[in-house]
Amino acid sequence: MDSVERIQKGEEYIGVALGSEHGVDPISNTTAYHLVSSAEECIVIVLHNHPSLSDFSLSDVQFLLRYASVKMMVVVTNLGNISYLVKGKGYAYEKAVALFNEAVSSNNEAQDLKGLQKAADHFLKNCCMVGIDYDNR
């Protein structure tokens, strides 16, 4: 049975997409793409490091918002910190996109790495207002 059949039957299945030195695209692998695009619900775990040692970047958040099937995103940093973003029962897509756009505007005005992190932090500090739970351990 191939991956598409297993996904369609709702069986548990894992797709792995490897990144490069400068980025990671969780759906760059065919199997991972099929999982995200055809599953009713899925969890994406991203293992990567950001230069600032931050957890979620705006690119990570954009991925979470883009795919309705992704209900949880987990980031494990190079220092072993684990952070979660979970779409809760009160998740409001339109409000989440508006909050994301606020963060992107701040990001576009950033002059340095600290400014870029501040933009991502803006989303993370306010995401509970749009039904997304954030936890960092």
Please identify what each model-predicted range represents.
Residues 18-69:
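Short HxH-centered metal-ligating active-site micro-motif
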Residues 10-29, 83-89, 98:
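Short amphipathic beta-strand/extended segments with alternating polar/hydrophobic composition
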Residues 69-137:
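Divalent-metal-activated hydrolytic enzyme cores
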Residues 1-16, 73-76:
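Short beta-strand scaffold segments in enzyme catalytic cores
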Residues 2, 28, 36-38, 52, ...:
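Serine/threonine-rich low-complexity intrinsically disordered regions
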